Amino acid sequence: MAALGKAEESQGCFGLFLLLPGPSMQPRLFVLVALSVLLLSGRAGALTEGLYCGRQVCYDVLGVSRDASKGDIARAYRQLARKYHPDRYRPGEPPGPDGETRESAQEKFLLVATAYETLKDEETRKDYDYMLDHPEEYYRHYYHYYSRRLAPKVDVRIVILVSVCAISIFQYYSWWSSYNEAINYLATVTKYRIQAMEIAKQQGLLNRTKEKGKNRRSKEEIKSEEEEIIRDIIKNKIDIKGGYQKPQIFDILLFQIILFPYYIFKYISWYVHWIYTFNIQGKEYGEEEKLYLIRRNMKMSQSQFDTLEEHRKNSFLEQKLWIKENYEVYKLEQEEEMKKKMASDPRWKRYRRWMKNEGPGRLTFADD
């Protein structure tokens, strides 16, 4: 087929040469046409250089036709692999009856293996057949060949799964670290420490640390055990909200992805129930629904809203902030109150005075 392409190109160039006028221009044009033919023929002959089986056809290497099945290709490969396997030849051994040496057999074995690797995969075989049928698409063949060779062999799904698991493990341990950090901080706060000590005395937990006799311990051991008791009481009695709350296994990324369909179904069910109950039937909001609307108006997350004290939530309910108009009035009042505080705050006064007199410092590259 490549030879046929060369012949057609040569004939086309020769026809162009015959149609060109002027005897004085013929030598120059002859050189131009000859160079074009040489370049085109060289490119056509190098179409498969360095790709797949090189200048040989992979089907011919295995001795099969282009219509051969995977089974036929595998059988031909096994037969030729046994024949040309380098282990059958010793180094320095003279050529056998078939004229093969260890070096030539190794070259043929590698060529047979390359042909088999090319034809056993459906996608690679399609690319190779396309190259045989369209040798003129030189750069396309190079792109497809090396894109497959350099493509990662690991399944992308495995990479994603491992990444999600790694992120989930990091999340879980970092959350535990933040939670323990919060507990250690609360154990140093006088208010919570005194309450924890009172609870420990009522439960008789501190009396055990001051045992005498054989079980007597050093002051450092007693102090360490008391600290551990206080930390345990704070863990059990104080409900920490927000970013320092106690980690839950179902909050990590892996379980969030697994439970995502459930959360979607739950949200749709809740939304349909809300529309039917309050928009269609016209029922009044309960306390939970009112707090949800207040939180949505304030654009706060659930964890942020949970950190608010109960008296503030009750104040929001008394002001009926679930109603949009009431919330807008409340928002303006809060902004005005904040402006008054800033105006009377000595620190803000000093800052405004400094900005007025001196202003922020400037960077300059001018020479003094």
From Swiss-Prot:
One of its GO terms (cellular component) is membrane. GO terms for biological process: protein folding. It is a multi-pass membrane protein. The keyword Membrane applies. It is found in: Membrane. Gene3D superfamilies: DnaJ domain. Pfam families: DnaJ. Keywords: Chaperone, Membrane, Transmembrane, Transmembrane helix. The chain crosses the membrane at residues 25-47, 158-178, 252-272. Residues 57-132 form the J domain. Belongs to the DNAJC25 family. This is DnaJ homolog subfamily C member 25. It comes from Xenopus tropicalis.
